[in-house]
Amino acid sequence: MEISDFSSMKLNSRPELIDFEGISMIHYFTDNWEKVKNFQARPDDILIATYPKAGTTWVSYILDLLYFGNESPERQTSQPIYMRVPFLEACFEGIPFGTELADNLPTSPRLIKTHLPVQLVPKSFWEQNSKVVYVARNAKDNAVSYFHFDRMNMGQPEPGDWNTFLQKFMEGRNVFGPWYDHVNGYWKKKQTYSNILYMFYEDMVENTGREVERLCSFLGLSTSAAERERITKGVQFDAMKQNKMTNYSTIPVMDFKISPFMRKGKVGDWRNHFTVAQNEQFDEVYKQKMKNTTVKFRTEL
């Protein structure tokens, strides 16, 4: 399939939030629900799960390089990452749905991405004991990144100004529901399902090489130190931001004049957005929402 297939992606207007299975969603991720729900996972599938804007593309690219970087290097220059790692629940008019792309992947293992909260992940992934790589990012930076993403992506609801968006974020009125429930849901699942690797965006920024090693160890991959180093260099933020195959510049519904898909990739950028009052309110809400969990985040390095 050619890259140009995505240029026929059609959107008439920004979607409205809808309530779906108890969380906020948009129809682009629910219109194909029967097929998503009944998706047939395989034992060697690798599901990359994150809340939006938490490092999905980064981990997708690392995994793609680990598995296919050597055996089919042409993938890296001819196919954008969203074709190599299909977005399972996506169904936009004019392009193949995520389930169809995943079903037709020629590779093994199949790398598949989702933003679904844990309770909505197709049950065949658990039944087949597929491996799941979850990436979590601290709530403050995640909120900032999501705000800029919503501004530039016409496939997302209108975000309003920063303060409006932040209030919605704290209330969990974002596409894919509350951040708090998302990160906690997968953290809890990890206690009963051993095939989840729970990663933190902040750890990846701090030491990408170390986290690539953790991935290899979880996936049972034996890669040489030289190979891991080559991959670590290739997935640095600035390299990916310039790379047409990873920066989403080939998707017409994203307006890069407003904000690039890959903006800063830093830890602590929230300090440039939160006022003192917003920060105090956010901390208060955070304490309430996260009081029954052991998962801990770093908001700066």
From Swiss-Prot:
Enzyme superclass (EC): transferase
UniProt pH dependence: Optimum pH is about 5.0 with n-propyl gallate as substrate, and another smaller pH optimum is observed spanning pH 9.5-10.5. Optimum pH is 10.5 with dopamine as substrate.
Keyword Transferase: yes
Positions annotated to bind 3'-phosphoadenylyl sulfate: 53-58, 137, 145, 201, 235-240, 263-265
Entry note: thermal dependence: Active from 20 to 43 degrees Celsius.
EC number: 2.8.2.-
Keywords: Catecholamine metabolism, Cytoplasm, Lipid metabolism, Steroid metabolism, Transferase
Gene Ontology molecular function terms on file: aryl sulfotransferase activity; sulfotransferase activity
GO annotation, biological process: catecholamine metabolic process; steroid metabolic process; sulfation; xenobiotic metabolic process
Compartment(s) where it occurs, according to its Swiss-Prot or TrEMBL record: Cytoplasm
Gene Ontology annotations for the cellular component aspect, listed alphabetically: cytoplasm
Family designation: Belongs to the sulfotransferase 1 family.
Job of this protein: Sulfotransferase that utilizes 3'-phospho-5'-adenylyl sulfate (PAPS) as sulfonate donor to catalyze the sulfate conjugation of a variety of xenobiotic and endogenous compounds, including dopamine, T3 (triiodo-L-thyronine), T4 (thyroxine), estrone, DHEA (dehydroepiandrosterone), flavonoids, isoflavonoids and other phenolic compounds.
Protein name per Swiss-Prot or TrEMBL: Cytosolic sulfotransferase 3
Species for this entry: Danio rerio (Zebrafish)
